[in-house]
């Protein structure tokens, strides 16, 4: 479980960012912007949850083959799930504010790019 903790911590940080961004959009631009932003964040966050589940199911040297297979399956599933969620959002949600959707989507992805740089960093003097 300790090796899985950073992934789940990152997912929690992403979820908090999604919720704060959606609430901020709701307050400043109205309900359409708010739920559009929430959809964009969920389109990024849910596939990341799927990937984390698939990627960290196995551990240990004996499961090396399963780990690699699981990573590839997780990434493929993440891409497919992202495409399906975008299609569902644009086909099924009217009205939709695309800039809010894409903005929070990108913000959520940026959290996953930047958070590993800050997580677990210890500053010690030489």
Curated annotation (Swiss-Prot):
GO terms for biological process: proton transmembrane transport. It is found in: Cell inner membrane. The chain crosses the membrane at residues 10-30, 32-52, 71-93, 98-120. Keywords: Cell inner membrane, Cell membrane, CF(0), Hydrogen ion transport, Ion transport, Membrane, Transmembrane, Transmembrane helix, Transport. Disulfide bonds: none annotated. One of its GO terms (cellular component) is plasma membrane. Its main location: membrane. It holds the Pfam family ATP-synt_I. It comes from the Bacteria. It is a multi-pass membrane protein. A possible function for this protein is to guide the assembly of the membrane sector of the ATPase enzyme complex. Belongs to the bacterial AtpI family. This is ATP synthase protein I.
